């Protein structure tokens, strides 16, 4: 079973408070999401393998460490996930970026894939799928399914705010995927919004309604 990590770092929690605040404007919301994504990326990459290399400092020859062998990919779920990409790339600029677009079928209410673009070497990469919110879990489940059916084998999921229902749904369908969360909230309301949550992340990020 994949693990669930909830980050309690003071900087993440401080910035998340302003992200949640309904009075935070589009510009600040966007910048704060970017900053929290960077802080979370620092934690999510903590277990990357290292190898020892020989270098020359200005003083003498030395042995030092570099990340070993891992090819990384970041996959935002369109559209709100786009706001987390640059924050991650600040720490791992060599990562390739894919995209998964989903819409909700008006009759079944289930997510339907309409766009997928991934790096050509899918099987060789470790992917971080990102979306600000994990509410019902439907979009995350379908996005990860899209990656797996194209050959991805090593996937992590990262979000700012999650509902217990979404975590349970994602674990039910993708038990091999670790989940990284800035805050695990109380529940979903009758409209499917996370409570207390942060509203509609896409609308707040892009200034739409």
UniProtKB/Swiss-Prot annotation:
GO molecular function, one term: GTP binding
Annotated catalysed reactions: UMP + diphosphate = 5-phospho-alpha-D-ribose 1-diphosphate + uracil
CDD domains to which the protein is assigned, alphabetical: PRTases_typeI
EC primary class: transferase
Gene3D superfamilies: 3.40.50.2020
Binding site for uracil: 194, 199-201
Record note on cofactor: Binds 1 Mg(2+) ion per subunit. The magnesium is bound as Mg-PRPP.
Keyword Glycosyltransferase part of the UniProt annotation: yes
Pathway(s) it belongs to: Pyrimidine metabolism; UMP biosynthesis via salvage pathway; UMP from uracil: step 1/1
Pfam families the record matches: UPRTase (PF14681)
InterPro entries per the UniProt record, alphabetical: PRibTrfase_dom, PRTase-like, Upp_B, UPRTase/APRTase, Ura_phspho_trans
The entry's keywords: Allosteric enzyme, Glycosyltransferase, GTP-binding, Magnesium, Nucleotide-binding, Transferase
Activity control mechanisms: Allosterically activated by GTP.
One Gene Ontology CC term in the entry: cytoplasm
Protein name (Swiss-Prot/TrEMBL): Uracil phosphoribosyltransferase
Originating species: Bacillus subtilis (strain 168)
């Amino acid at each position: 079973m994949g693990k669930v990590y909830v980050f309690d770092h003071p900087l993440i929690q401080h910035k998340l408070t302003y992200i949640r605040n309904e009075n935070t404007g589009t510009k600040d919301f966007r910048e704060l999401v970017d900053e929290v994504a960077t802080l979370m990326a620092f934690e999510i990459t903590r277990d990357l393998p290292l190898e020892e290399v020989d270098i020359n400092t200005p003083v003498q020859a030395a042995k030092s460490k570099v990340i070993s062998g891992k090819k990384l990919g970041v996959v935002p779920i369109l559209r709100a996930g786009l706001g987390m990409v640059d924050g991650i790339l600040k720490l791992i600029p060599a990562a390739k970026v894919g995209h998964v677009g989903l819409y909700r079928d008006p009759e079944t209410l289930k997510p339907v894939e309409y766009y997928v673009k991934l790096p050509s070497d899918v099987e060789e990469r470790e992917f971080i799928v990102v979306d600000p919110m994990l509410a019902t879990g439907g979009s995350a489940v379908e996005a990860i399914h899209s990656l797996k059916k194209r050959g991805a084998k090593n996937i992590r999921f990262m979000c700012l705010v999650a509902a217990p229902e979404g975590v349970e749904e994602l674990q039910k369908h993708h038990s091999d995927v670790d989940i990284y969360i800035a805050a695990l909230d109380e529940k979903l309301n009758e409209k499917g919004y996370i409570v207390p949550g942060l509203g509609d992340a896409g609308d707040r990020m892009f200034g739409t309604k």
